[in-house]
Amino acid sequence: MITFKDSIEIKAPPEKVLGWLIQRFQSKENYQAWHPEHVDIRWIKGEPLKEGSIIYAEEYLHGQLHKLKFRIIKIVRNREIEYRALFPFSLFVPGNAFIIESKGADSSVFTATSLLRAGPLFKMLGKKRMEDTKRHIKEEGENIKRALESPK
């Protein structure tokens, strides 16, 4: 199992970080504003960001358009969103999470985690794909930081 994990400190309280993140999941335009490789997003079952709800997302990863469905597994207010890919991607990507840790009144650490099931052959042949995935996750965090720390 490979774990992709990236953390970034953001000068904003957890509720502001989570609020910004929640807005990204509300419309295609907001989702696209988060990262240039994001294409589309919509809720296809349940209420937005409620446990058990299903979201459909399109984004470019390693140069290829991926059409993905995720189930929201766990929500901890102002702290965590855990979600899992649905079949067939669940065979390769069994878990993902966004975690926000408070670092005082006006600071948080945002951590994005994605798990990948991969054997030795993929690790050897899929090095570029793994590097692109790491870059994408890192850029998402940097874009949150930039949006929340930039003067309005």
Predicted regions and their residues:
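Hydrophobic ligand-binding cavity/cleft-lining segments
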Residues: 1-45
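Short, surface-exposed coil-to-beta transition loops
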Residues: 3-5, 65-69, 92-97
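Well-ordered beta-strand positions
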Residues: 9, 73-74, 101-102
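Short strand-connecting beta-turns/loops that link adjacent beta-strands
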Residues: 13, 77-78, 103-107
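Hydrophobic pocket/interface hotspot
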Residues: 17-24, 31, 55-57, 72, ...
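Glycine-rich portal/gate segments that line the openings of hydrophobic small-molecule binding cavities
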Residues: 40-88, 139-152
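Beta-strand/loop substructures that line and gate deep hydrophobic ligand-binding cavities in soluble
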Residues: 84-135, 139, 146
